[in-house]
From Swiss-Prot:
It comes from Mesomycoplasma hyopneumoniae (strain 232) (Mycoplasma hyopneumoniae). Zn(2+) 3 binds at residues 179, 223, 225. Its EC number is 3.1.21.2. GO terms for biological process: base-excision repair. CDD domains: AP2Ec (cd00019). This is Probable endonuclease 4. Endonuclease IV plays a role in DNA repair. It cleaves phosphodiester bonds at apurinic or apyrimidinic (AP) sites, generating a 3'-hydroxyl group and a 5'-terminal sugar phosphate. The gene is nfo. Zn(2+) 2 binds at residues 143, 176, 210, 255.
Amino acid sequence: MIKIGSHVRFRKPDYLFGAIQESLENKANAAMIFLGPPQSTFRVKPENYKLQDYQKHFFKQIPPEDIIVHAPYIINPASPIKAQFSNDFLVKEIEKINYIGAKFLVLHPGFFTSFTKEVAKKQLISSLKSILEKTKNVILLLETMSGKGSEMCANFEEIVEIVEAVESPRIGICLDTCHVWDAGYDLKNFPEFCKEIRRTRLINYLKVIHLNDSLSPLGSKKDRHANIGKGFIGLESLRKIIFDPLFANIPKILETPYVDNKPIYDQEIALLLKKV
């Protein structure tokens, strides 16, 4: 089954109900939300989410397991300085996700800044173990990154090493096509790309795909998303991810730029699903 959706707006007054309504208007059967501003840890109380309205009207069209939650960008679980704040926040975030009944929380692995990469890697593994010990049900998904600055997890071997070191069924990977392209993985050579995903065992942990084109050339380490078919990856390669059996049943989530201050996810979803 093809599962496809986009980042949708989780905002007052309708929050979850409004977000899933927007997804359905885009002809999607999956969705991704932030539970607050992406650059902030501010959160409203779960009783404001309009959960019952969602359950009454949209539960069957987009069930909770196909609602992906993304953690805010500002947390850094790989930092020995910021890990405690990040971990405490993520524990509370997972409690809110449990309230919704969603299954996956995507998070950026973090940066190594004033400390070594090895220190950051050990801290990240420790953080993930601590969060999982204090929570239930939700699966944490580390996102593949572009390698900008001192980002963690810009290559498949590293992200798989970290996931396997956590030793939990509640840890997995979210692959972002723009990020891995910018990190140097050539999606245009699709057979080789799939071979690399298998070789590194990343496929064993892959639970969600962020499907984005890239404004930047291969290996640029820029992390600049483009609309589908308007970047260097191209429509043909991204469409292969939709239809290839290797990625069947994995939710594909678009995070592409607005056009004229409006999302065009409905157009992009239709474009991707069109068989040529």
